[in-house]
């Protein structure tokens, strides 16, 4: 049986996650979706399957946030769903996990890679973050959880854009791209985002696609004199030094000279020289061991000495994996591009260390 694609839907309090989710659940899209909801502090049916007339199955838990403190509960819920599906008791095509507004998506994402049974039954597709356009600037200023949710995102949906003017939206987009230049941003008025904006994003696939916001790259190039830029990343799944999730963020490099300096920020490394595989593996392993809790997402498409294929790596916190990508084209310029998103990461240490790994 193919692993069940799973989406983590996150966003700060009141951003509009539930509005969006309710619409997805009731839309005629032909998909059977099992939703794991976390209604913190409300009375819900614990570990019960509720079958709505649309045919989706929903698991509601009231044991606290879906985060590392209750990771065991999430594993139990996912395992129970998979068993009920295998026995024919319920039927669903995919899972959406809605986190509370205060949840850190990191531990939720890690669950798919650290638990063997969950990893065998499910495939983490993406983290989708809903951002309240009206209140986001204040939330990002005051709450590191809001910054972490943006930093982890594979896709950002802006809600309540009808309540602010175009200039405010552009300023917010600039700030979001500085935190996470890897995640595309789309607008979602009152939960009207197409379902394609939330499902089948393949954000955690090991592929050789690494697209970054061009304005971020231009600003970053101007900010540094070396021949690299600095970006951020994604993730896959072998364990490099098991870890709990991050409750920290990365110190902001203010590429856009905004008035806001966010704790979580991204940087990019680029080079047209090839890496020595052994040196790079050793260096990245040591960085993950030391800074893993601060490393939210990271991804790279790499050129390795003596290899005719690209190497793709990505990680979440201490969980890092790699795989072979496509062959380099005959006329393609070989090179490496890596992006790191995190809190207070020593960028200069990373850059200098990566340069030492080049042939």
Mark where each language-model region is.
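Short, hinge-like loop/turn segments at secondary-structure boundaries
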Residues: 51-54, 146, 202-205
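A secondary-structure boundary/capping signal
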Residues: 9, 36, 132, 159-160, ...
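Nucleotide-state-sensitive switch-loop elements of NTP-binding domains
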Residues: 2-139
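C-terminal accessory "lid"/substrate-recognition subdomains
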Residues: 155, 164-329, 333, 343-359
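Phosphate/Mg2+-binding loops and adjacent switch elements
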Residues: 83-197, 202, 212
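Helical mechanochemical/support elements of P-loop NTPase systems and associated helical scaffolds
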Residues: 5, 9, 29, 41, ...
């Amino acid at each position: 049986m193919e692993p069940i694609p799973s989406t983590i839907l996150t966003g700060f309090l009141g951003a509009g996650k539930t509005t969006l989710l309710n619409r997805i659940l009731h839309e005629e899209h032909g998909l059977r979706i099992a939703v794991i909801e976390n209604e913190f502090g409300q009375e819900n049916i614990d570990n019960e399957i509720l079958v709505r007339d649309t045919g989706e199955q929903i698991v509601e838990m009231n044991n606290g946030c879906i985060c590392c403190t209750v990771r065991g509960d999430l594993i139990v819920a996912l395992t129970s769903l998979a068993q009920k599906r295998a026995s024919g008791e319920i039927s669903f095509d995919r899972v959406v996990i809605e986190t509370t507004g205060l949840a850190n998506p990191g531990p939720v994402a890690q669950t798919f890679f650290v638990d063997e049974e969950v990893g065998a039954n499910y495939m983490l597709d993406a983290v989708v973050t809903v951002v309240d356009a009206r209140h986001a600037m204040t939330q990002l200023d005051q709450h590191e959880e809001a910054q972490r949710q943006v930093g982890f995102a594979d896709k950002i949906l802006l809600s309540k854009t009808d309540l602010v003017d175009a200039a405010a939206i552009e300023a917010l987009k600039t700030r979001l791209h500085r935190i996470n230049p890897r995640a595309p941003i789309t607008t979602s008025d009152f939960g009207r985002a197409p379902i394609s904006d939330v499902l089948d994003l393949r954000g955690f696939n090991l592929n050789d696609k690494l697209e970054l916001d061009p304005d971020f790259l231009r600003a970053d190039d101007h900010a540094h004199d070396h021949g690299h830029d600095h970006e951020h990343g994604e993730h896959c799944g072998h364990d490099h030094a098991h870890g709990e999730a991050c409750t920290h963020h990365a110190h902001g490099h203010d590429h856009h000279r905004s008035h806001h300096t966010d704790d979580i920020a991204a940087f990019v490394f680029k080079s047209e020289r090839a890496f020595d595989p052994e040196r790079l593996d050793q260096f990245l392993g040591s960085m993950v061991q030391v800074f893993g809790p601060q490393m939210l997402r990271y991804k790279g498409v790499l050129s390795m000495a003596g290899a005719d294929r690209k190497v793709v790596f990505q990680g979440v916190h201490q969980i890092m994996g790699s795989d072979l990508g496509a062959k380099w084209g005959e006329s393609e310029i070989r090179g490496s591009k890596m992006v790191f998103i995190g809190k207070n990461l020593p960028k200069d240490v990373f850059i200098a260390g990566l340069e030492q790994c080049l042939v």
